[in-house]
């Protein structure tokens, strides 16, 4: 049976997650980030990427409706994101550069005849390597191919992404030309029309800028995080001084096969990503993806405040990514730095007005409070 998926329809797996919502409690939570940032090991130089395009989801595929959940996006909304990305990577204080990243604003042109969907969207990734460059380079080169070649793609994108992370881990181990003791975290963003799917394994982070608010779309997989520590100890691992088995500062990674058992066996160091999906709206202005070299020295809200201020001035995501890197270096980050900024509109963010309720008693909106917190976080 042939079906047409317009921008107002999307194909999902059954485990749909609702969009993030913000509250005063959430704002406080985002500001009280985990201060225990472990420094990864050592880091061959990088490049900048910047391009722009407008895309819209319209895919034809033979589907078994029993295996799909079709969710209508907001029928009243005519919003379609315009993908404009920029990136910046710097070696920083490290001896070597081990980060890799990828920015693809137009998947159709990039993949060509390799896929039968007439129009997909965009794909971005940040890969923070450690113990050498082999793992990060391998994942950057292959992860998108593993996703689109998976039998679940494009009908069950989340399943395909999870499978691709595991396949990348196994295929890396099988490549005799590579140092399989090297490893990498992996953070990817896959966009179909207005549907954004974030996958993360490690301590890179994706943050959505929503009218000045920072909405975290990924969790930092640190060994001393409660959920990760429980999982690690259940599988026979230990967390010592914030390090997995006293060796690694992340709880999830691709590679590092010197710390893993036979293929298919449960292991404290997991390559499995956590996924978060959301439907983009007019309020969603940009996405920041960065390695821990950025987040070690600034909060998510601070990064959003800086990015928004820069975009209001020049509306250039590449310059914006460079400014975030510059600010992190200014704050003496000890790690490699990689930042991607993806804008969802051709226009710059609009100024947010803070309205006072009265002369006697004044209040500030949640959006204004977020902006103020970002400024107080140390950005002039």
Curated annotation (Swiss-Prot):
Induction: Induced in shoots by drought in roots by abscisic acid (ABA), and both in roots and shoot by salt stress. This is Probable protein phosphatase 2C 27. Disruption phenotype: Decreased salt tolerance. It comes from Arabidopsis thaliana (Mouse-ear cress). Confers salt tolerance by triggering the expression of stress-responsive genes. GO terms for cellular component: cytoplasm; nucleus. Keywords: Cytoplasm, Hydrolase, Magnesium, Manganese, Metal-binding, Nucleus, Protein phosphatase. Expressed in roots, leaves, stems, flower, and trichomes.
């Amino acid at each position: 049976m042939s079906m047409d998926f317009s921008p107002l329809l999307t194909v999902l797996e059954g485990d749909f997650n609702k969009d993030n919502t913000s509250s005063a409690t959430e704002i406080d939570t985002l500001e009280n980030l985990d201060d225990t940032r472990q420094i990864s090991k050592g880091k061959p130089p990088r490049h900048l990427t910047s391009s722009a395009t407008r895309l819209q989801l319209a895919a034809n595929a033979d589907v078994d409706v029993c295996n799909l959940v079709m969710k209508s996006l907001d029928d009243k909304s005519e919003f379609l994101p315009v993908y404009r990305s920029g990136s910046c990577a710097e070696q920083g204080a490290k001896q070597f550069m081990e980060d890799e990243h990828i920015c693809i604003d137009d998947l159709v042109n990039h993949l060509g005849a390799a896929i039968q969907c007439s129009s997909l969207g965009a794909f971005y990734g940040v890969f923070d390597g450690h113990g050498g460059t082999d793992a990060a380079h391998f994942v950057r080169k292959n992860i998108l191919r593993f996703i689109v070649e998976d039998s679940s793609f494009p009908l069950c994108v989340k399943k395909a992404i999870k499978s691709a992370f595991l396949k990348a881990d196994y295929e890396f181990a099988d490549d005799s030309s590579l140092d399989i003791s090297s490893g990498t975290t992996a953070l990817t963003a896959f966009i179909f029309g207005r549907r954004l799917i974030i996958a993360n394994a490690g301590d890179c982070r994706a943050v959505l800028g929503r009218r000045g608010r920072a909405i975290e779309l990924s969790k930092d997989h640190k060994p001393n995080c409660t959920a990760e520590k429980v999982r690690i100890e259940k599988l026979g691992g230990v967390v010592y001084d914030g390090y997995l088995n006293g060796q690694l500062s992340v709880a999830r990674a691709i590679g590092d096969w010197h710390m893993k058992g036979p293929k298919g066996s449960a292991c404290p160091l997991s390559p499995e990503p956590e996924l978060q999906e959301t439907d983009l709206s007019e309020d969603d202005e940009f996405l920041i993806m960065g390695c821990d070299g950025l987040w070690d020295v600034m909060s998510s809200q601070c990064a959003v405040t800086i990015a928004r201020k820069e975009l209001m001035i020049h509306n250039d995501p590449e310059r914006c990514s460079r400014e975030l890197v510059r600010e992190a270096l200014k704050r003496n980050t000890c790690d490699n730095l990689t930042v991607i900024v993806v804008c969802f509109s051709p226009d710059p963010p609009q100024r947010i007005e803070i309205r006072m309720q009265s002369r006697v008693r004044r209040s500030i909106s949640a959006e204004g409070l977020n902006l103020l917190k970002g400024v107080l976080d140390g950005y002039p």
